[in-house]
């Protein structure tokens, strides 16, 4: 996709930005993602079947992503971005799923009922931290994961 975007940027002299998003989440997120699955089971006080939990998650609140889009949009409007650019929304703080569960158990009123190893890993799981990223220089994560998780779980 980036090859096509780069072509159009050069061919028509357009500022085009490709944003690479990681594990996004937010209060009204209804997608079939691991945090929503955990939340649904937590609310129902049910057993949560998970993988062994060694994969990494790069959790980014959707509000931080919106802030990045705002920054990039402003720079395009002010003609500060020329050509084709790639930016990531990488929090640079990956967390293993099993450590996320520990963090949630410290935050939540009731401990999660988790069975690790009950599910298989998916093909595209991330088992090592990808250091290569190109976050926009003016973009920083404003939200704190503990605060965001409390909001996400409505506590």
What residue ranges belong to the model's regions?
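Conserved donor sugar-nucleotide recognition element shared by glycan-biosynthetic enzymes
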Residues: 1, 31, 97
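Hydrophobic alpha-helix immediately C-terminal to the catalytic Tyr-X-X-X-Lys motif of short-chain
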Residues: 1-8, 38, 100-104
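Active-site Tyr-X1-5-Lys
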Residues: 1-17, 43
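A general structural signal for well-ordered alpha-helical packing
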Residues: 2, 35, 66-69
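Flexible, glycine-rich beta-alpha linker
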Residues: 17-34
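A glycine/serine/threonine-rich, flexible loop-to-helix segment
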Residues: 31-39, 124
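C-terminal substrate-binding subdomain of Rossmann-fold SDR/epimerase-dehydratase oxidoreductases
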Residues: 42-155
């Amino acid at each position: 996709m980036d090859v096509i975007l780069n072509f159009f940027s050069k061919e028509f002299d357009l500022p085009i930005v490709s944003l690479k998003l990681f594990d996004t989440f937010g209060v009204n997120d209804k997608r079939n993602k691991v945090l929503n699955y955990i939340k649904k089971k937590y609310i129902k006080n049910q057993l949560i079947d998970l993988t062994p939990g060694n994969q990494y998650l790069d959790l980014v609140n959707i509000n931080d992503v919106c802030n990045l889009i705002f920054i990039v949009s402003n720079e395009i409007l002010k003609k500060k971005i020329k050509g084709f650019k790639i930016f990531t929304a990488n929090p640079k703080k990956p967390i293993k799923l099993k450590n996320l569960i520990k963090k949630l158990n410290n935050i939540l009123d009731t401990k999660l009922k988790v069975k690790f190893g009950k599910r298989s890993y998916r093909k595209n799981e991330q088992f090592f931290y990808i250091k290569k990223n190109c976050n926009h220089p003016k973009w920083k994560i404003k939200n704190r994961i503990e605060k965001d998780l409390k909001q996400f779980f409505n506590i």
